[in-house]
Each structure stands twice: as structure tokens, then as C-alpha cells.
Design a protein with these regions (language model features):
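Cysteine-nucleophile amide-bond enzymes
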Residues: 1-163
């Protein structure tokens, strides 16, 4: 019974995510490319969790993977979390109105971290904390969730990065 309830909740959440994604992609508008050093993120597990990183230009995102390696990926690679079982449809980026905003210093910090390894921990040393560290230049123990990362957002909204 519990499994059935969880399955139904996941199904409803997935349907909501589809509607939300349609709204974000078609009605609200999109951006052609994030700003260099901008925060980017996508949903995981039907929108229950998110994955974040820093856009470094040329269709590349630097992010902390689940095995603790700092990787540089294109958009598809960035969304391909959870061994390909992630149904993410969109990558979001930080915007002020319709214009993407970034942080050149964050892009540099992200690129310098490329190839390094960390002791990944879902709640203590994750992608959001890595992203926050790139943005601020220092470890930020207060950021482990996506909603905490939002306080470092330079813009006032999130927009979908158009394909």
C-alpha cells in the first residue's frame, strides 16, 4: 500500500513537472545561453531534488558529480544524472528579467576546480555547496540545498536555457 501511494505521488509530481516545464519553456520565455559564471540547475527524481553547477561558456557546465569528481559537461551530460534515469527536461539559469546574469570570478573558480575530487556527501558536500563555493570563493557550510543556493542568485528569476 505504501509503495502504491508513493508511486501515485511520483506520477502526480511528474505530471506537475511536465506542466511546469511547458509553462517555463513556452509561456515564460527562454534564454539562448546562460551568462558566463551563471548558476545553472536542473530537476532530478521528478523534481524532488535538483542538481546545480556553474556555466563557463561554450555550452559547458562545471559541476560536482555524485562520485565526488568535479566535471565539465555539456547540457545533456549535466542533466544525465542518476545513471540516466533522470527525467530532467530543462536547464534553468539565473536571470535579471529576461537577461542572464553571471559572475566571471565564479567561472574561473569552477574551471580551476575541474578534475579535482571531493568526499561527496548528499547533505554535507554536494553540488549546491560546490556551486556556492565557486560563487563566493570560500566554503559555505550554510548551503547544501537548492533553496539555500538561491540566496546567492544575482538575478530575480530563473529562465530555461533554450536548446
Amino acid at each position: 500500500m505504501l509503495f502504491t501511494l508513493i508511486s501515485r505521488l511520483a506520477m502526480y509530481r511528474s505530471q506537475f513537472s511536465l506542466a511546469e516545464s511547458f509553462t517555463d519553456n513556452v509561456i515564460r520565455g527562454t534564454v539562448d545561453e546562460p551568462a558566463r559564471g551563471g548558476i545553472v540547475w536542473c530537476e532530478l527524481a521528478g523534481g524532488y531534488v535538483t542538481h546545480s553547477g556553474i556555466y563557463t561558456g561554450n555550452n559547458r557546465i562545471v559541476h560536482l558529480s555524485g562520485d565526488g569528481e568535479v566535471l565539465c559537461s555539456d547540457r545533456k551530460g549535466f542533466m544525465a544524472r542518476l545513471n540516466g534515469l533522470n527525467p530532467a527536461m530543462s536547464v534553468y539559469t539565473d536571470c535579471q528579467g529576461r537577461l542572464p546574469v553571471g559572475n566571471i570570478a565564479a567561472a574561473g573558480r569552477a574551471l580551476r576546480a575541474l578534475g579535482s575530487r571531493r568526499q561527496y556527501h548528499l547533505l554535507k558536500e554536494n553540488c549546491h555547496r560546490f556551486t556556492a563555493e565557486c560563487l563566493t570563493g570560500r566554503p559555505d557550510n550554510a548551503v547544501v540545498l537548492h533553496r539555500q543556493l538561491k540566496r546567492l542568485q544575482r538575478g530575480n528569476t530563473w529562465r530555461v536555457w533554450e536548446d
